[in-house]
């Protein structure tokens, strides 16, 4: 399982509209950017409590990249 599949698994387990979840991956020499799109009604689930949910998810996903000496970030589009 790669980081996109893992992120998709986490997000789909907490949102209502699972079909609206999409993730785009862009990589350069230093960074990997995962752009996350969810249904407008599910945004509160992802950003809940001043971003605590998405920040926790970001920390989990970053574990994938510690050994590769790359940085990863997740951007949530509204």
Label the model's feature ranges:
Residues 1-45, 55-78:
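RNA-contacting regions in translation and RNA-metabolism proteins
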